[in-house]
């Protein structure tokens, strides 16, 4: 009888353990059988993102933009459209991006820029690698790891999905 009680107790204990993982249906790695979210949800970076915060070399430059939107496409290309405060003509950049499998590092390679001044797209090769501090369904928060842009030592960016 004691063995049966011990066996039933062990079964009850094991059966009461909740499965951990990602229980957010908006995440790429959603698991409907998960009872307790353990913070491992991975979200798609694809879509349209609007700038919320831009800190360059310690200076908050967010308000220097009237508009700043980045479109990230499924073929790993992107298009950035931004309008400086007081200007009436958008500047566009395009290139490619890579997000690593663990969603901790995002790299951009700018390939072209268009000042929309009648001269069309011009080569502009620039690379940025960011540490992804947070990527949710609605928010992207990242910090610069490296770039080949002279005089840029730090960048903090927060964007919201639109």
Model-identified regions with their sequence ranges:
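C-terminal motif of bacterial Sec signal peptides marking the signal peptidase cleavage site
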Residues: 14-16
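Secondary-structure capping and domain/repeat boundary segments
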Residues: 71-76
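Primarily marks secretory-pathway-exposed extracellular/lumenal segments that are disulfide-
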Residues: 5-6, 18-50, 57, 69, ...
């Amino acid at each position: 009888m004691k063995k049966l009680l011990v066996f039933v107790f062990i079964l009850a204990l094991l059966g009461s353990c909740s499965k951990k993982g990602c229980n957010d249906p908006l995440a790429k790695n959603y698991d409907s059988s998960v009872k307790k979210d353990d913070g491992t949800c991975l979200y798609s970076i694809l879509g349209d993102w609007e700038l919320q915060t831009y800190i360059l070399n310690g200076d908050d430059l967010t308000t220097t933009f009237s508009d700043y939107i980045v479109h990230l496409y499924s073929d790993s290309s992107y298009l950035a459209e931004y309008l400086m405060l007081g200007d009436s003509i958008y500047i566009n950049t395009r290139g490619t991006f890579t997000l690593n499998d663990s969603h901790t590092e995002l790299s951009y390679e700018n390939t072209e820029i268009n000042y929309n001044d009648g001269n069309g797209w011009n080569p502009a090769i620039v690379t940025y690698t960011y540490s992804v501090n947070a990527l949710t369904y609605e928010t992207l928060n990242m910090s610069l790891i490296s770039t080949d842009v002279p005089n840029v030592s730090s960048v903090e960016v927060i964007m919201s999905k639109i």
